[in-house]
Amino acid sequence: MTRGTPAFGKRHQKTHTLCRRCGKATYHKQKLRCAACGYPDAKMRRYDGWGQKVRDRKGQGTGRMRYMKTIARRAKNGFRSGTQAAPKVKAATN
């Protein structure tokens, strides 16, 4: 039985296929689990305890941030809602 470098040439089967949640080719066909996002787990797989690089790739601020990008502006104004802007008064000309 050969071990090591020659044995690696015999590997030609695909262990991973496309994941239906994250779209990466990281869904393990035998384990039935995605290595990237953790599908079919209910919660997305996190990369918290790893290095800075992987957190920058997958963490908050790398996507659309549809909700988070408005937070700074709303916080500056005190999270007010349902109010009307005061009408602008034209400057008096002489």
Curated annotation (Swiss-Prot):
Its main location: cytoplasm. GO terms for molecular function: rRNA binding; structural constituent of ribosome; zinc ion binding. Transmembrane segments: none annotated. InterPro entries: Ribosomal_eL37, Ribosomal_eL37/eL43, Ribosomal_eL37_CS, Ribosomal_zn-bd. The keyword Ribosomal protein applies. Gene3D superfamilies: 2.20.25.30. Zn(2+) binds at C19, C22, C34, C37. A zinc finger (C4-type) spans 19-37. Keywords: Cytoplasm, Metal-binding, Ribonucleoprotein, Ribosomal protein, RNA-binding, rRNA-binding, Zinc, Zinc-finger. Binds 1 zinc ion per subunit. Its cofactor is Zn(2+). It is found in: Cytoplasm. The keyword Transcription does not apply. PROSITE patterns: RIBOSOMAL_L37E (PS01077). Belongs to the eukaryotic ribosomal protein eL37 family. This is Large ribosomal subunit protein eL37. It comes from Tetrahymena thermophila (strain SB210). The gene is RPL37.
